[in-house]
Amino acid sequence: MRRIDPNKLELEERVVAINRVAKVVKGGRRLRFSALVVVGDKNGHVGFGTGKAQEVPEAIRKAIEDAKKNLMEVPIVGTTIPHEVIGHFGAGEIILKPASEGTGVIAGGPARAVLELAGISDILSKSIGSNTPINMVRATFDGLKQLKRAEDVAKLRGKTVEELLG
């Protein structure tokens, strides 16, 4: 998979979660912050990243940098996805179903951020199992990675799109 150059895209950032993490040492607790950020151009490109630092803004900056390195392309048909798919990560699972125009994004918290920034405006989703933000984001990305356009599937099978769709 080729890397996507973040400088050529107009990316929008969304902070999904900020977590205060404590390391207990002899003198007390050492506090740090971890941030989970999703970036996307609302036109088929989306990425996520995590960052850790002593201060919240610095953690967010690191997360945005990381997210720009992990961009991926999402196949979009009209305003939705080409087919139903199930994404897994750890104990988290998400079902993504295409929806008719005008339905909107029906998704919970972290998954909604990913889908909206990917540019999908009509989709149904259901998250099952772990609902930790990082697990939901990674499961959503797993689902989006599995998506294929009809043209790609037809090419792999050596058929035309018409033959494939019957």
UniProtKB/Swiss-Prot annotation:
Matches recorded under InterPro entries: Ribosomal_Su5_D2-typ_SF, Ribosomal_uS5, Ribosomal_uS5_bac-type, Ribosomal_uS5_C, Ribosomal_uS5_N, Ribosomal_uS5_N_CS, Ribsml_uS5_D2-typ_fold_subgr
Biological process (GO), any one: translation
SUPFAM superfamilies reported in the protein's UniProt record: dsRNA-binding domain-like (SSF54768), Ribosomal protein S5 domain 2-like (SSF54211)
Similarity-based family: Belongs to the universal ribosomal protein uS5 family.
GO cellular component: small ribosomal subunit
One Pfam family in the UniProt entry: Ribosomal_S5_C
Keywords tagged on the record: Ribonucleoprotein, Ribosomal protein, RNA-binding, rRNA-binding
Note on domains (UniProt): The N-terminal domain interacts with the head of the 30S subunit; the C-terminal domain interacts with the body and contacts protein S4. The interaction surface between S4 and S5 is involved in control of translational fidelity.
Transmembrane segments annotated in the record for this chain: none
Keyword Ribonucleoprotein: yes
Subunit structure: Part of the 30S ribosomal subunit. Contacts proteins S4 and S8.
Keyword Ribosomal protein: yes
Domain S5 DRBM span(s) in chain numbering: 11-74
Species of origin: Geobacillus thermodenitrificans (strain NG80-2)
Gene3D superfamilies (alphabetical): 3.30.160.20, 3.30.230.10
Gene Ontology terms, MF aspect: rRNA binding; structural constituent of ribosome
Function per UniProt: With S4 and S12 plays an important role in translational accuracy. Located at the back of the 30S subunit body where it stabilizes the conformation of the head with respect to the body.
Record-given protein name: Small ribosomal subunit protein uS5
Domain of life: Bacteria
PANTHER family (UniProt xref): MITOCHONDRIAL RIBOSOMAL PROTEIN S5
